[in-house]
Amino acid sequence: MSNILDGRELAKEIKERIKKETEILEKKPRIDFLYFEDDKSTEVYFTRAKKQAESVGMIGSLHNLPVNTTEKDFLTLIEYLNEESETSGIMIQMPLPKHISKKKVYETISIEKDADAISHVNLGRIFIGDSNLAPCTAKSAMALIEKSGINIEGANAVVIGRSEIVGKPLAHLLLQKSATVTIAHSKTKNLKELCKNADILCVSIGKAEFITGEYIKEGAVVIDVGINVLEDGSLKGDVNFEEASKLASYITPVPNGVGSVTVSMLLDNVLYLHKNIINKK
């Protein structure tokens, strides 16, 4: 039976450290959350994130925008917050409404206030080895891998998923630790074979319980990034937990795994950005 990598424990450790660091700051970090009123799940997530920010001494500000907000007005708001001296970090709803260009948002947000490291420059920094600022979900997954205690150097790591905010940055974070990394996706033909050879298996594909025990190498560390809501309202990951946990040495549950750490990593990013702004003055 696997050891469980409980994200709640790691999140608590991170927030305790952030709170201590924030307490000694004369000016407190502020994070601005931008989202649209029709996205209720993001509203719930950002409201909780705001409360957690305030619990560690930060300031949170919610921007609940009308659905018909134009792309121009949305980009103008980002530009305003880029210049707003009270704002330390900006967190933007993803995915965006269809009428707003993701590319333009990535290009508009200031690299100095990019709380989820989605700008082209900040993503590029990860690719050249700078991991101080990384997308929150990828950073959370990496922290849980490290918490398992596995020797990452030389390990075979398979990342299933190639998104800009999870799969690709997570692969580069693993590369920085000298893992041998394979990125798999929906077009990968020998997926089961690749997974069976993985010492570290990270899954982010958005398909409930897609990865069964047949994909798991005995003793592997399994990181399940997926969160899928079933018809009965229950939450399931991309990995069949019951089957995988019989083979893996360490595994993240869903819920209470990677998702439990993401807000703490967001706050960690905001604190990092805030300190950089202070140091430049």
Curated annotation (Swiss-Prot):
Binding site for NADP(+): 161-163, 186, 227
Molecular function terms from GO: methenyltetrahydrofolate cyclohydrolase activity; methylenetetrahydrofolate dehydrogenase (NADP+) activity
Pathway per the UniProt entry: One-carbon metabolism; tetrahydrofolate interconversion
Entry's Gene Ontology BP terms: L-histidine biosynthetic process; methionine biosynthetic process; purine nucleotide biosynthetic process; tetrahydrofolate interconversion
Pfam families (alphabetical): THF_DHG_CYH (PF00763), THF_DHG_CYH_C (PF02882)
Top-level lineage group: Bacteria
The reaction(s) this protein catalyses: (6R)-5,10-methylene-5,6,7,8-tetrahydrofolate + NADP(+) = (6R)-5,10-methenyltetrahydrofolate + NADPH; (6R)-5,10-methenyltetrahydrofolate + H2O = (6R)-10-formyltetrahydrofolate + H(+)
Keyword line: Amino-acid biosynthesis, Histidine biosynthesis, Hydrolase, Methionine biosynthesis, Multifunctional enzyme, NADP, One-carbon metabolism, Oxidoreductase, Purine biosynthesis
InterPro entries hit by this protein: Aminoacid_DH-like_N_sf (IPR046346), NAD(P)-bd_dom_sf (IPR036291), THF_DH/CycHdrlase (IPR000672), THF_DH/CycHdrlase_cat_dom (IPR020630), THF_DH/CycHdrlase_NAD-bd_dom (IPR020631)
Oligomer status and interactors: Homodimer.
Family designation: Belongs to the tetrahydrofolate dehydrogenase/cyclohydrolase family.
HAMAP family: THF_DHG_CYH
PANTHER family named among the record's database cross-references: C-1-TETRAHYDROFOLATE SYNTHASE, CYTOPLASMIC, C-1-TETRAHYDROFOLATE SYNTHASE, CYTOPLASMIC-RELATED
Role played: Catalyzes the oxidation of 5,10-methylenetetrahydrofolate to 5,10-methenyltetrahydrofolate and then the hydrolysis of 5,10-methenyltetrahydrofolate to 10-formyltetrahydrofolate.
Designated name of the protein: Bifunctional protein FolD
Organism: Brachyspira hyodysenteriae (strain ATCC 49526 / WA1)
